[in-house]
């Protein structure tokens, strides 16, 4: 930026004091300070905008390279698929020409059955647990009411 030393600033201050006068100098100094602050903020905003545009350009270039790579992969997949399809048609044509019926009579259907989520039976899963594990884990296998438990464990009366 501008190289202003202490001696130059003192000279500028003395000239301003003589030209402007002591009563208007504080107001002029405040105005100059606010204008310098605005100029610094404007320069900082311009620098930020330039940096942002440079980053956007880099991102655009990166996006273009990724899109080109994706197109190349897609093209490779399409060529491989078409080569595979041509080979299959060629081999099926050879098989039908030689009299082989494998694959021709079967129809090579491409019908794939729909996926059905297996229903979980939690009772079966619970029953598949070993008995010794149930006893250790405190799993109740025979649930009784409170009165039935008392009657079961009540000592017998002797007559």
UniProtKB/Swiss-Prot annotation:
It comes from the Bacteria. GO terms for molecular function: protein transmembrane transporter activity. It holds the Pfam family TatA_B_E. It is a single-pass membrane protein. The chain crosses the membrane at residues 1-21. Belongs to the TatB family. The Tat system comprises two distinct complexes: a TatABC complex, containing multiple copies of TatA, TatB and TatC subunits, and a separate TatA complex, containing only TatA subunits. Substrates initially bind to the TatABC complex, which probably triggers association of the separate TatA complex to form the active translocon. PANTHER family: SEC-INDEPENDENT PROTEIN TRANSLOCASE PROTEIN TATA, CHLOROPLASTIC (PTHR33162:SF1). This is Sec-independent protein translocase protein TatB. It comes from Acidovorax sp. (strain JS42). The lineage of its organism: Bacteria, Pseudomonadati, Pseudomonadota, Betaproteobacteria, Burkholderiales.
């Amino acid at each position: 930026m501008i190289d202003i030393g202490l001696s130059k600033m003192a000279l500028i201050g003395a000239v301003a004091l003589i030209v402007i006068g002591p009563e208007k100098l504080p107001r002029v100094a405040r105005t100059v300070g606010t204008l310098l602050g605005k100029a610094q903020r404007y320069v900082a905003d311009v620098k930020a905008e330039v940096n942002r545009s440079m980053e956007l350009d880099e991102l655009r270039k990166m996006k273009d390279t990724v899109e080109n790579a994706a197109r190349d992969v897609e093209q490779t997949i399409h060529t491989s698929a078409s080569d595979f399809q041509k080979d299959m048609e060629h081999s099926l044509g050879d098989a039908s020409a030689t009299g082989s019926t494998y694959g021709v009579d079967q129809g090579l259907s491409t019908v794939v059955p729909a996926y059905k989520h297996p229903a979980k039976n939690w009772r079966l899963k619970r029953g598949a647990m070993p008995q010794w594990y149930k006893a250790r884990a405190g799993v109740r296998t025979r649930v009784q009411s409170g009165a039935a438990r008392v009657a079961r464990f009540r000592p017998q009366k002797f007559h």
